[in-house]
Amino acid sequence: MNWEAPALVLSASLFGEANALVHLFTSDHGVVHGLVRGGMGRRNAATWQPGNLVQARWRARLPEQLGSVSGEIIQANAARCLGSRLSLACLSSICAVTDSALPEGERYSGLFDDTGRVASLFGAESGEQATAFEMATLLRWERILLQDLGFALNLTECAVTGERADLVYLSPRTGRAVSRQGAGIWASRLLPLPGLFLNPEDTGIPADWSAGLRLTGHFLTRDVFGPLHRPLPAARIRLADIVQSLLSPHRQKPDLSGEESGHPA
């Protein structure tokens, strides 16, 4: 069985002296695993960095076998993010979450398109506005991932009152939005719902990003990784830690340059 297609590199690990065991995400074949001979060597290692888009060629005698992979880089997303700690953390997170969440060999064409688009945005710009845009983009992507896996969040109306305005909470049990009025005395038991999930023009502030990561992380942990007996990926946890570091009122300005030393709802 042979095929050739654009693929997003999700992970690459050393296999033998210089070979790379890679996990790729493709439009027609979903997540696939393969062996790149010499993939960790000096000439090829940069190509197979997680987050890069490559033109991959996969060959195996049978579909269930570990394929032999070769390819050329199309888009060097990983290198573009090296100048920003947060951009690289975002890119690493979407790769790790995708790699851990999706079953091998199942087609998710729409999610592949969304993931490739998002990966191409990280590190493209710099500054506070770019940081906000990247975090909002990542959080919306995580919502799309949940939806594509069958765990859509319902943000259209309040689960208690039916109203569509002032939706500021989400039920951790049902994934349905709750208005300020509908929350009442149960507000402390609900997840804060950042406005960036409702308004495409809203990119939020660090407190919103932290709340958003907690929100999507709750459903990823419970609905996606829990049944697989897997923890939330380490790259996703690191991203949440970086965002949390932006919230401390007494912190020094963080180095994001990449140069590191029961509610009724």
Where does each model-flagged region fall?
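Non-catalytic alpha-helical scaffolds and adjoining flexible linkers that form interface surfaces
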Residues: 1-21, 25-265
